[in-house]
């Protein structure tokens, strides 16, 4: 039993260490709980600081009788962690994750292309769940605070024309590409003998433009550069 408890503690410690390492460079709030003048060190709690912010911004009505953080509002959020396929945000004391595909109008390969730990960004609040005050949940949307540039960019794309781009994903036989002109594109076929993979640079020929979905449809004719 002691070894099981020790293993759980070691696993938790490793998880906390990874979380802290991922947050390197991020500004955080904390409440001082203790002070040791001899060693010139303090004991502080980030959790307590986040709970205080939650009470202030999510649970306490403002002058209009509504909480400051609510659905539809545009607010600032801190980027606390960045991975290839998602980022983690702190929105006034509540943390949430946003998938890379929901970060911008144009598809991206890696969230590190756009975000770094410590960034402060604007997000639109999609939903807030305060049914359990001990576990408030929020859904944040960074993409919708900017205008969608894709319809205008598609105006410059011509059928049967050739463009270069980067593969952002290969899923279920469909190749997702961000063209260098900022247009999203999909291909179901690749004429190159090599297998296309994420982050490869490719040549793409447009066969159809889907303006409803704001994507160019076509064929990958050649892999210009593979990322191995």
Give the ranges of each region predicted by the language model.
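Single-stranded RNA-binding regions, centering on S1/OB-family and related RNA-binding modules
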Residues: 1-228
